[in-house]
Structure formats: structure tokens, C-alpha cells
Amino acid sequence: MGMDLTCPFGISPACGAQASWSIFGADAAEVPGTRGHSQQEAAMPHIPEDEEPPGEPQAAQSPAGQGPPAAGVSCSPTPTIVLTGDATSPEGETDKNLANRVHSPHKRLSHRHLKVSTASLTSVDPAGHIIDLVNDQLPDISISEEDKKKNLALLEEAKLVSERFLTRRGRKSRSSPGDSPSAVSPNLSPSASPTSSRSNSLTVPTPPGLDVCSGPPSPLPGAPPQQKGDEADVSSPHPGEPNVPKGLADRKQNDQRKVSQGRLAPRPPPVEKSKEIAIEQKENFDPLQYPETTPKGLAPVTNSSGKMALNSPQPGPVESELGKQLLKTGWEGSPLPRSPTQDAAGVGPPASQGRGPAGEPMGPEAGSKAELPPTVSRPPLLRGLSWDSGPEEPGPRLQKVLAKLPLAEEEKRFAGKAGGKLAKAPGLKDFQIQVQPVRMQKLTKLREEHILMRNQNLVGLKLPDLSEAAEQEKGLPSELSPAIEEEESKSGLDVMPNISDVLLRKLRVHRSLPGSAPPLTEKEVENVFVQLSLAFRNDSYTLESRINQAERERNLTEENTEKELENFKASITSSASLWHHCEHRETYQKLLEDIAVLHRLAARLSSRAEVVGAVRQEKRMSKATEVMMQYVENLKRTYEKDHAELMEFKKLANQNSSRSCGPSEDGVPRTARSMSLTLGKNMPRRRVSVAVVPKFNALNLPGQTPSSSSIPSLPALSESPNGKGSLPVTSALPALLENGKTNGDPDCEASAPALTLSCLEELSQETKARMEEEAYSKGFQEGLKKTKELQDLKEEEEEQKSESPEEPEEVEETEEEEKGPRSSKLEELVHFLQVMYPKLCQHWQVIWMMAAVMLVLTVVLGLYNSYNSCAEQADGPLGRSTCSAAQRDSWWSSGLQHEQPTEQ
């Protein structure tokens, strides 16, 4: 990697073994008595684009100017390397070294020193001296003007690229909270030492008596002593030498370039002169004359990244002063203090050097890493600072103290500080706009909103809000005694109202809601009513206690007000002896009158406050009451609707029970005994299904005529045991129309509301029993009537048949004529059965069985009648048959006639 320097200037081997270190150019060791860079800080070759313009002073030094070695130098275990010289004259030796220093035209500014190089960048001249190929002055090479112009153009282009890179959007600082160690161990090896940076270096020569392995302090080979921010590179200690004006001009140019690259904060123009004076003071500074300003064993190398290289274990007690000083200057609202000595050399009062609370280097500019919160004035934004970092930010403390300050004073201080900074640095406007992060803008906006909210709160605190919740939250007035306050606060927790503004807003019944709320549905109205009713019921339990508490608080407030006014009046009257002058007497009387007016106004204020509170409560409850009234109206409307439907159903049931053929239409189930009159057996009973109810309800609507109904609605009313409807017989239409028992309208069927099964169950038990008894009695009467008619028909037939032997032709004609009435009578019988028992007719198989039985009975009766008539005539006195030819030739009598001869 680098060259190991093993005591080439007469240092003992023991000390040299501990002080072996790598030479990587000018940044290897910036200060005599400090450690060099780690191996991570590699010596990479630098192209001309990354270098400084020629002519810039460089602190690289060749070992040619070293004095003769001195013997007897003791070594300490620390890796500090101090080259020996004349211990009696350290100042003269330093001046000699400065005079013999070789200036390099280039300065390393590239980031490539962070990478490790495998090749050495040093060489040895013919005289045996080590030459830094990067930083030391090399033999002049003849370059043409054209090449020089090209080099300058490349340098300018590199500058533009570097500026664009450094000012890119979203660029963060090079420093982060984790970069700077909180405590640096003194036993770190050179390879593990903290990384040094390019700028903000603070060099303090260490007195020879402070290091154990000490000689006179002298610069190391390839390690120029850089001043603060690389802006105070000294070319010669003597002001008479010609290099000083050139060095100052080069420093100005170097500063301008660093400002453009964002590595250095720009300074105001008036500070330039003081900076030059500070540079001279730093060059002529003798650490032996000011031993108290240099901490023991400490030679910090601070930089923009917040990193440092230390030789001593811990800082002295003087170093902890800087954190307090920074905090104090932050409170005063001025930028960080820059005395002439601190600006350039960083050496001044005892508190000018040191570290912050966490052991971080706190130079005048590098120390500004301890940021102040956004509400406090800050120095101009620096490229090397991060607004969102900083482990020792005193933000909460500053914010707490700042919140206690008056608002006007805070705004005045903030405006004055900002204006003063801009006046001191007029050239920073564009620079700050480019660098200001987004977070700063957000914090500024939040601060403005906070100020606005405070102003609004101050304006709104004229009178407290007249509500129970607000009184409970804000507590009792301050003039009450602590015991009374404690008692009231304890008792107040138990009597809080439940119907608060939060509940009203949640239920969307608060009057102060913006805009007109959409109307609530019936379900929402019901939910709101339930919650409000519960809240009202809960409030009713604590109403008396809340009234007593409010009255007691009101009385206490009035009494306290009266006491204060009386005390004020007493204090004025006690000072009546002081009012000697006539004008004073008038003022005295005026004050007494004002006190009386205040007394009356206080009483009126109390009464008006009660009225205002009552009106506000009425306003709060108005929407809630409106919602509850709406719910009651909905209930009333629903009740009227259900009641009307129920009455219609009862009326329809009564009408159906009064009909002779009501069971075919009303759908009311009949009992088993009413159905057993004709068939002799029980039919299965079924409840009327819900699907039947709409057709049933549509049969009896107001305004309908009894004969305006159509019969297709009837099949749904009759159900068979298997659930299949039977079509009505066409012959049933005239009978139904004659009796006028159907009065449904198909047009009204769709519009009629469908009654649910619950409406059927709402019928009283008495109505059901009465309807069943009426149906049973009517069925019984009709059954008896039909049975009687059948018996009459049979008797008539028998009478006619008995007369047939005397009048054979008439009997034959009457038999032919009776065929038609018999068929019609059968049809009437089937129709009667269908009307009486609709469920029986729904099954076609039962109908055919009944028809077959009737037909067989008719045939049997006919055969029986004809047989009897012929047998009686054969037994007559003439001894011969008098049957007619039709009877003899008929198919039922032919068999009998064949059987008679065989029997005779």
C-alpha cells in the first residue's frame, strides 16, 4: 500500500515501529502530532478535472528541510509520530520548515481518496528525497498554449459537472448521525483511525512537553498543516516574502470554488479583511505562550463530515463549554460566533474548541452540526450539514422554553433574526433557495398554522362555552378554593350528561352540521330513536344532581364576583384620604359608580347566561326531538295501515261466512264433521297457504260490484290433499253467477296488498268458531235438502213404473224422455258434490269412481224395476204377459224372458 517510514530522521526504532504509517499525499497527516489517515483513505491517482487550479498553495512538504536528528527521545505507546528537531527552538524550526516547504500546484479534492490503491503515488528523487507525485511540485514540463486551453476547458467542464452533482435535487448531506463517533478510543491503530476530510480542518500544534514521544513539532513528509476549511494554507510565516500575496489570492479563488461546489459556506464581503488578519495571527501563533487554550494531548482535526483524528484519550474539562456556548448563541438568535481568531485559526477563548455532549467535534463551523430546531433562528444552510440529522439536537428543550415566550415577542425575534441573517449575507438568497430541503418548508408551514391556532384560541377565550360538557372539561373558576374545586370535580364526574354533542353528531341529528343532511330512512330513524330514548332515560337518573350542581356553581360564581367587587370597592374607599384634589374626588365618585354598574352587570350576565344555556340546549335537542316525532309518525302510519288491512280481512271473512257456497271461495278450512255429511269420511285439513291470501284479499275491495268478478281466481282457493289445484266445472259458472257469490276484480288483484299469514292468525277465536258453526249448519241443511230431493225423485220413478202396465206405450215414451233428465240429474249431483266439497273434486280419480258407482246403481235400479213390473203382470188373472214390445225387446229384459220359460 504505502511506504513504511521507519525513523529516517533519527527516531529510535521503538518509536518508529509504533509510528509506522502510510503516506498517501497531503491528507495523510494534517497536523504534527496527529495520526494519519486509515488505509481506507486510499491514494488514487487524480485526473486534472478533479484538481484545483494551478498556483494554489499546498502544504506538502519534502523531508529535505528536516534538521539533524536528536538523540534520547522517549516513546509512548500511542502511535503519534513527532519528528525530532531542536527542542530548544521549536518556533525557529517551524519557521525554517515553512520557508523550505515546496508548494504543490494542485490540491486533492476528489472523492477517489476514499478508495484503496494498490500502487504507491510516491517516488524518490536523485537526492534521495521522497516526492509525492500528486501533491508535490514536479519538474516543469513544457506545455503548449493549446494544451493549456484544453486543460482549462476541461477544468471548467468538471466544475460545472461537480456543481450540478452537488446541487442535485434530493441530495443529502455527507454527514449522518452514525458517521461521527461519540467517543474515540486513544488506542486506535493508524489504519482504524477516523477518516479525515478535505475541509474544515482545525490545526493546533501540540507543545513538545505534552507528548511523551516528543520532539519539536515539525511538519511530516507529505502532511501539510491545513487550516480551517482548507482556506488558510500558509506559504510563508514572514509577511515580507513574495508568496503571501499570491497565497491570499489563491485562497480567495479556492474559497470561491468551494462555495460553488457546496463544500464551504460563503462569507459576507466585510469579513474578508478580518479573515486575512486572522490568518496572520494563526501563522504567528505560538502554543507555548497560550498553554491554557490547548487541551492536554488533544489535537482535533475536525471537518465537514463531523470526523476527527485524536491523539489523546479524553477531552479536558474546558471542551464541554462549547455546547453551552452554542446553545446560548442559538437563544440569542445570532449566527454562530465568529471572532477573528475563531474564523481562521479556530483558537481563541477557552470555549472555542471542544466537543459537544456526545463527543462530537464542535469547531466554529463544524460545530454547527448541533442543529437548532426550526422554530429557532439558524445560520445559513450549509452543504455539509443535514437538517434531519444530529444526535444532540436540543429540540424538545428549546421548543418547551419557546412555547412559554409571548407570541408577539417570539414573532419579533424570529423576523429580526431572519432579516439580520439575510442582511449580513445578501449573496446567499439563491444558494439558500436551492439547498433548503422540503422538510424545512413543512416545518415552517406547521409553525405558521400553530401561530394561527394560538391566535384563534386567544380570541375565543373571552367567555367559556355554556355547556355542561365544556364546564366539566375546563373545570371550575380559578377563584374557588382548592377544596371546593376538588369536591366539585369529584361530584362532577358522576353527573355528566349522556346526550352530548358527540352523540348527536354521530346520530346525524346535530344542527351545526354543515349542509343539509340527507333524510333518514325508517330503519335509521328507528335506530336513532332507540339510542336517544336510552340516552334520555339515563339522563333522567342524573337530572336532579346535575341541576343542583349547576345551581351551586352558579351561586359560587356570583358570590365570588360580589366578593371581588366588594373588595375592590373597599380598597377604593380605604384610599379616600388620598383623594384631596377636586378632580381626584370626581374620579373617586366615578369609580364607585362604575363598581355599582359592574355589580348590576354581573347579576344580569348570570341571568342571561342561564337563558342562553337553555336556548342552546333547546337548539341541540330540537333535531333529536324532530327525529323522535318522525319515528312516532312512522309508527302511527304503520299502525293505521295494518289496522285497515285487518278490518278489511275481518269484513271479508264475515261476508264469506254468510254465503251459501262460501266454502268454495273464502278458503276457510272446514271441520271434519261438516265434510262428513255427504262422504261419510274425514278429508285431510290443510291451512290456507300464503299464496292464497293475495287472491283472497283481492276479492273484497271497496267499490267493487258483486257480479264483476272473473272466475279464474277460484282455482287457487281450492286445494287438494296433494297440493294440486282442480279446474272448476263449466256448469258451476251459472250457479255461482246466479247466487252472486263472486265479486273479485282481476284488475284490482295486482294492486291489492298481500296479506301475510300473520294477518290470518290475528282473527279472534270467537270469529273462527262462529264461522265454522255457520258453515257446518249450512252444510247440514243443504245435505238434508238434497237427500230429500233424491228420495222424492225415487218415489216419482216408482210411481211412474207402477203405472206402466196399463199404459205400455206411455211408459216406453216416458222412459225415453227420462234418459235426458237422468243424465242432467247426474250432472247436477256431481256439481253439487263439487260445490259442497271442493277438495273432493280436485282429484279426478275420485270423480270417475263416483260417476261409475252412480252409473252401476242406475242400471241395477232399472233392471230391478223392469223385472218387478213384468213379474207382477205375468201373475195376473189372464195368465199372460202384458209387457210392451219395447220391454220385451230391450237388452235388460231379454235375458229375463229367456230365463222364465226354463223356470216354468
From Swiss-Prot:
* Residues with Phosphoserine modification: S110, S386, S676, S689
Task: Output compositional bias ranges, type Low complexity.
Answer: 57-72, 185-203, 354-367, 706-721
Instruction: Identify its membrane topology class.
Output: Single-pass membrane protein
Keywords of the record, alphabetical order, are: Coiled coil, Cytoplasm, Membrane, Phosphoprotein, Sarcoplasmic reticulum, Transmembrane, Transmembrane helix
Its cellular-component GO annotations read: endoplasmic reticulum membrane; perinuclear region of cytoplasm; platelet dense tubular network membrane; sarcoplasmic reticulum
This protein's major location comes to cytoplasm
**GO BP of this protein:** cGMP-mediated signaling; relaxation of vascular associated smooth muscle
Q: In which tissues is it expressed?
A: Expressed in the colon, rectum, and cultured colonic smooth muscle. Detected in various cancer cell lines.
What is its subcellular localisation? Cytoplasm, Perinuclear region; Sarcoplasmic reticulum; Membrane
Membrane spanning stretches: 844-864
Instruction: Tell me the segments the record calls region Interaction with PRKG1.
Output: 144-176
List compositional bias (Basic and acidic residues) regions by residue number: 248-258, 270-285
Q: Which spans does this entry mark as compositional bias, Polar residues?
A: 175-184
Q: What induces it?
A: By silencing of the transcription factor BTF3.
Coiled-coil annotation: which residues? 540-638
Renumbered to this chain, the Basic residues biased-composition regions fall at: 103-114
Oligomer and partners: Part of cGMP kinase signaling complex at least composed of ACTA2/alpha-actin, CNN1/calponin H1, PLN/phospholamban, PRKG1 and ITPR1. Interacts with PRKG1/cGKI-beta and ITPR1/IP3R type I. Interacts with HCN4; regulates HCN4 channel activity.
This protein's name? Inositol 1,4,5-triphosphate receptor associated 1
What species is this protein from?
Answer: Homo sapiens (Human)
**Gene behind this chain?**
IRAG1
